[in-house]
């Protein structure tokens, strides 16, 4: 154990519930052995009430509920040397003032992406079997032996829209299956795609050729409404659409219109826009739409992976090693 006198001073700064989820007892114990956590958990309300308490903090361990690092807040953090954010996107917490200070920030984006990729793979395989349609048909008719046409997980085609952190995780996991993987991502090189076992093509080709299309595009001004009704109308007979990214990337009204006309298609939506969807939204009633309440990412004990990821990053920082998951200003701008 490092001597208290030589430890950097640190604080936990996030909401109470994610604090318990991300930084469980075992994770907190490891952190307390590495840094001098000199005050109890801090939240946005406690910081607003007593910002001077931040003055000694050299490292901050955070997550969902972290306040934005504004110029005003940073004025109370003169000794801050690094931020360890045990969740995903940091777009909502970083500012120009933060980047101007050149403070390293690392995140649990990769750890948080693991359950999303697992969730997606499960949906892909079930989608290739048209599982939900078969369940619904059996409930309605009792028919056991008459199966719908299925693509199956042999020689079928899976389409990925965007090959960011999670899209690449999904592609890696799909190597275990005998399926063809195509993807649209204008920022990915042919070399990267080849290493992932993916063939790059246009967005239109992904929707036309894939038996299952999985969306992994971050919600940015330039991607809002990227997926249109024309894309859905072009999908193969019996194809499945999965969205674990952000609802606003899809033009929902156009999607719904096509799904109403094409009962052979199926949409699995873990995200909507807005969230939750309006009670009178047609998507809540369509038989070929299943909505889950944004559960693909890390939940409850799964969040401990995020915390452990931050422990390992903290060790690297204290040892003077490069941070494995550090986020640059440029990358932060492309995060969801």
PLM feature segments, named:
Residues 146-237, 241:
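Rossmann-like dinucleotide/phosphate-binding beta-alpha-beta segment
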Residues 65, 88, 211, 217-219, ...:
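Short glycine-/small-residue-rich Rossmann-like dinucleotide-binding loops
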Residues 86-87, 104-111, 203-204, 245, ...:
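Short beta->alpha connector loops at strand-helix junctions that form conserved
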Residues 1-59, 334-336:
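N-terminal glycine-/charge-rich "phosphate-binding" loop or analogous flexible N-terminal tail
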Residues 105-106, 229, 237-336:
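Rossmann-like dinucleotide-binding domain for NAD(H)/NADP(H)
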Residues 31, 52-53, 73-76, 205-209, ...:
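Structural alpha-helical scaffold elements that stabilize or flank donor/cofactor-binding regions
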Residues 103, 108-157, 169-172:
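Phosphate-binding beta-alpha-beta segment of Rossmann-like dinucleotide-binding domains, i.e.
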């Amino acid at each position: 154990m490092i001597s208290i006198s030589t430890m950097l001073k640190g604080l936990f700064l996030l909401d109470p519930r994610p604090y318990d989820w991300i930084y469980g007892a075992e994770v907190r114990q490891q952190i307390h052995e590495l840094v001098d956590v000199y005050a109890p958990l801090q939240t946005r309300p406690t910081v607003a009430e007593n910002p001077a308490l931040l003055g000694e903090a050299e490292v901050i361990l955070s997550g969902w509920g972290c306040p934005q690092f504004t110029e005003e807040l940073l004025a109370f953090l003169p000794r801050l040397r690094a931020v360890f954010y045990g969740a995903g996107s940091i777009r909502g917490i970083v500012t120009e003032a933060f980047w101007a200070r050149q403070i390293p920030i690392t995140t649990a984006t990769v750890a948080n992406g693991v359950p999303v990729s697992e969730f997606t793979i499960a949906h892909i395989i079930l989608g290739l079997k048209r599982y939900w349609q078969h369940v619904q048909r059996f409930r309605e008719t009792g028919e056991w032996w008459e199966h719908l046409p299925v693509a199956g997980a042999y020689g079928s085609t899976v389409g990925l829209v965007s090959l960011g952190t999670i899209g690449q995780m999904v592609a890696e996991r799909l190597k275990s299956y005998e399926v063809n993987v195509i993807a649209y991502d204008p920022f990915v090189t042919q070399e990267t795609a080849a290493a992932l076992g993916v063939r790059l093509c246009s967005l239109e080709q992904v929707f036309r050729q894939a038996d299952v299309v999985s969306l992994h595009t971050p919600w940015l001004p330039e991607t809002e409404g990227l997926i249109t009704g024309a894309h859905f109308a072009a999908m193969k007979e019996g194809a499945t659409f999965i969205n674990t990214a952000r609802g606003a990337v899809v033009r929902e009204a156009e999607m719904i219109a096509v799904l109403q006309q094409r009962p052979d298609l199926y949409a699995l939506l873990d995200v909507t826009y807005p969230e939750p969807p309006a009670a009178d939204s047609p998507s809540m009633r369509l038989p070929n739409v299943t909505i889950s309440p944004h559960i693909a990412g890390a939940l409850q004990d799964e969040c401990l992976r995020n915390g452990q990821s931050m422990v390992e990053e903290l060790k690297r920082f204290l040892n003077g090693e490069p941070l494995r998951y550090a986020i640059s200003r440029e990358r932060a701008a492309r995060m969801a």
